Amino acid sequence: MKDHLIVFDTTLRDGEQSPGASMTRDEKLRIARQLERMRVDVIEAGFPAASNGDFESVRAIAEAIRESTVCGLARANEADIRRAGEAIAPAARGRIHTFIATSPIHMEMKLRMSPDQVVEQAVRAIGWAKEYTDDIEFSAEDAGRSEIDFLCRIFEAVIKAGAKTINVPDTVGYNVPEQYAHTIRTLIERVPGADKVVWSVHCHNDLGLAVANSLAAVMAGARQVECTLNGLGERAGNAALEELVMAVRTRQDVFPCDTRIDATQIVPASKLVSGVTGFPVQPNKAIVGANAFAHESGIHQDGVLKHRETYEIMRAEDVGWGANKLVLGKHSGRNAFRSRLQEIGIVVASEEHLNHAFARFKELADKKHEIFDEDIQALMSDEVVTPDQEHYRLVASRFHSETGETPRADLTLSVDGQETRTSAEGSGPVDAAFKAIEAIAGSGTELLLYSVNAITTGTDAQGEVTVRLAREDKVVNGQGADTDIIVASAKAYLNALNKLHSKLERLNPQL
């Protein structure tokens, strides 16, 4: 029987640290439920000590998720670990993931600690974590640039202290596959008690080698891979979950292990993360890109038509492509709408929130004859800010744009429940709408990105607009969808402003 390869997803923690990818609690819950549906083994739900918002998100996920292990990240200090322990307390299966830097440059320049002090602190951290759970993971930050003898020493110490999973992160994406595999193999051979723990890897993609390094480590004995959907993450991102899972599954002739992932949920999960974060998936992205199973060449098309395995090493339907279908229409009722939301992993915060979302759905159904899952997900992407967080909302709009005249936007906004009218002119209707909103919300916000995508086909398709706003050191993405692109743009801008308004300062740990 083959070994079980544990899939540890950190989309909600490391993935969220990608600039602009900040998520609300409800957005994180939607993704966590989809990860559970996909049968991910461990969900790293966040960094509870970073902010009250992060703590509440991790705790909400711990309360909601029953099948997957829910993990909270903590630095190797008592305050962080106690905060993580409190956050995961409601979980059916909870884990604390604690870390400390081990490379010479980090110990000297960042921690200002000696190697002896680092080992002592790591052991103390395991002791604090054991007060909350027996499932403890220890990471040596920047292990990829750490001295192998010191890694052996600190890993031996934390294993004796009670750590159950040992993670060897390539924090800055510096390693190459052969080198990384040698490191993992050496650690497993040299560290006393290595056979009593699960060896884990966490690779970054700075040199485009995150997946290759992770797979090389698996061949060397690692049995947990840490990854994110769509490879989302800081800088160049993390190892992509979908690529790791399908590489191992497709090449069972090579790999001595397999995952328990339901691969048919991969594409729906990818689309959900893309929609929530506003980070589009590149068309040629392996597994989840729109062109991943497209064949343009006549020779390839001929081969596939005669026998699909001539050019396809896996089936599109096995990873969730082709599963979308017409689900609702203008005559669908509230219960049918609620049921469909649940089926695609969307949980609303309250009956009030459901009523508001259903009203939006009925408005869409009057404009659009056929409504697909993508339409519902896009509609909900600017509904995930719960009513108490919705400081700005578009109530009504009117746009004037005639040849030779300056475009103008007249908007009615709800600001903390009070309706306010605002108008502005601009170089185009979108510019006018944004300036009208700024007249109410105030200036000081920089627009970093504006993009439009058609959600489905047809002339009545909704347009989904993504905007990225920056204010001081905060960067957020906002989404809005409508059959009218100008309205969608205004919704996206307001969605981003709501996120900026409620976003708390948070720490961004590096692993």
From Swiss-Prot:
Domain Pyruvate carboxyltransferase positions: 5-267
Needed co-factor(s): Mn(2+)
Key words, A-Z: Amino-acid biosynthesis, Branched-chain amino acid biosynthesis, Cytoplasm, Leucine biosynthesis, Manganese, Metal-binding, Transferase
Region (Regulatory domain), start-end ranges: 393-511
Listed GO MF terms: 2-isopropylmalate synthase activity; acetyl-CoA C-acetyltransferase activity; manganese ion binding
Pathway in which this enzyme or protein is active: Amino-acid biosynthesis; L-leucine biosynthesis; L-leucine from 3-methyl-2-oxobutanoate: step 1/4
Pfam families (alphabetical): HCS_D2, HMGL-like, LeuA_dimer
Family membership: Belongs to the alpha-IPM synthase/homocitrate synthase family. LeuA type 1 subfamily.
Protein name: 2-isopropylmalate synthase
Gene: leuA
